[in-house]
Amino acid sequence: ALDVTIQAQILKLLRDLQGELDMAVLMITHDLGVVANMAENIVVMHHGEVMESGGLNDIFRNPQHPYLKALHKAVPRFDLAPGERLVPIREIEHHKGFLQEAKEPWPETAGAEAPLLKVENLSKAFQIRKSSLFGGAAGQVKAVDGVSFEIPRGECLGLVGESGCGKTTLSKMLMRALSPDTGAVTYNDRGALVDVLALTQHELTSFRRKMQFIFQDPFSSLNPRMPVFDIITEPLVIHGIGDDDSRREAARELMRLVGLDVRHLNRYPHSFSGGQRQRIGIARALALQPDLLICDEPV
């Protein structure tokens, strides 16, 4: 879950230590790129069972098991044709349930051509604390500098950059968790243009039903004192959506959508792995059926 530069440095350190100390390294990862660059012998597992094992060439050049073949097809390639989609490992059979029935349809004539979100010249700087003995003038760090973009409805936009380049800061400004120094954020609320930065606190609470956030860290973003059911349904309670029965059904449907066992709704976050916790965070963000979902590296 690191950016490529930091990841490469850590992997190089592991490789150097392995050589210096003449030891073996057992690496558990879901990243096939890391496996290809680091591993000599590979074991592919799924649900606690070994699907296939072998050397580097066997796994990457001559896969035998259907699951391993599906893994390779699901990895992005440079030779993908325009419009070509990756092949999912498993298709989720989703029947129309609570979420689809409760979703308010987008009016056909409501600003169909306008972008869902428009960001103009967004900037944010942070003050640097005075550290000199004589207390010189404090400096600034420009975290976001004049960023502009548009997101059409039904489209995805990816922001790419190394750690510390301002991706999370920008995301938090879109959600109004941080206030920008300059710029404008305009949201197309079914044809009505909303100045996000001008919303009052009361208006902002209602607005966040339309825009949700998936946090980068699945450990600190989940309340350890709350069971999964309460975590997923908390947004519904805050916004007064549904009754106990409908919220229970929504929680079950969301658990199925993110590939988690419905029987685990009463468990606490410490019972889950990092990847499972991230799925819980995704389920929570989807509970309100937002029109826009901001994902802060939800890997």
What kind of region is each of these model predictions?
Residues 191-195, 246-263:
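Conserved ABC ATPase "signature" region
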Residues 289:
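Conserved catalytic motifs of ABC-family nucleotide-binding domains
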Residues 56-117, 129-135:
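Charged, flexible cofactor/metal-binding loops and thiol motifs
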Residues 6, 10, 282:
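Hydrophobic anchor residue at the start of the ABC signature
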Residues 12, 184-206, 243:
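ABC ATPase NBD Q-loop/coupling interface
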